[in-house]
């Protein structure tokens, strides 16, 4: 009994710490939920710093909660003695809702209780509860931010569409189809351009919100698709201003920048490079979300080198608000883009929107000449169709298309590319990951080339478009395209998909 009495104060301290921790979390979340809306703030020099300070404070509070959890763990581990029964009963009485968990622990351990192990089990369960609460809060914040971003995108789209209508500019939707002229009342440029300028500032602020949350290293794997959509939308709006900014009366300092403030040209490059660097850091994390995006569609899944690719465990909450938003942002005239997709290049990054009936609707590619092997990166779905984030085939390249429900499909293939040498390819269909007993095989080479103008830097580049008409029909689960080449970069006479080449798109087009 003396031992139990000695532990009374320590047990009480432990319970008080738990209560305080949960109380502080509830208080912080409530404060964030009621934080002031900065979207209508004055657009002066103080606006961004105040907004950034709020975002910084939100990050600090999450870190503070994690510190409290860590401190609580240390407290428990340093106050272990032999008074299990009193500790157990006190917890049941003072921590409603957690009791069943501890009852289960008690049932598993039986009468021979190891108090140290018991306390560690307690704190592990409490940590799980608190971390889940924080993750749920973070998830909700992401969805709120993305919904706010969607409203801003809608407003920007409506304003710019009116401007395009006034100036007779043909704008395109996400399927590469022309958007009919708006039936709304025509407004003068004097009215529209200030509204477009304000809309851009609002978008910039909301995209910064999204980046702050979507690039959090602790949650990056969960929000990878949202990061993708956010990056592409933001870049699309920047692209519009680069293309039509002078006509929309944007000041040169906004487009070209000043000595102290970067312009949209630099922002575009920096933003794309940052976003793509997040992809490169997070390839492994991203595999955690792929399975939630693969139901019922043709997908591209490059297996890791040297082992069979296995679909990961599903993540439930990824992406719902993103799908509708992703259809809203391509507004600029696309006459200068190559056939087979609307490609915009910023330094070494490609963003491509493909026409209807493609295997995928959007792609992000990255190559700095040396390239990154496609085998390391998963795919994501965009608007009901998959995304292939990274392709730069310098080694032998394998594209594995997945037809999970084994629907019978008839299709042709179109490849948009820049080649250094011709490459022979194999196409085969099979029912398992390792590709045994392929049921079909065809060899083909790249042929035609066309020239197009890069709309960002006005540089003429050459792209080839090769079509393999087929038609190909299969109900197999996997479809594989393999590049056949000799891996000797020093020998120019060797055939193959060589150093310096790029693929802009590989399209399976339903017939």
From Swiss-Prot:
Keywords: cAMP. One of its GO terms (molecular function) is toxin activity. It comes from the Eukaryota. InterPro entries: Pest_crys_N_sf. Induction: Stimulation by changing levels of cAMP via the cell surface cAMP receptor. To D.discoideum protein M3R. This is cAMP-regulated M3L protein.
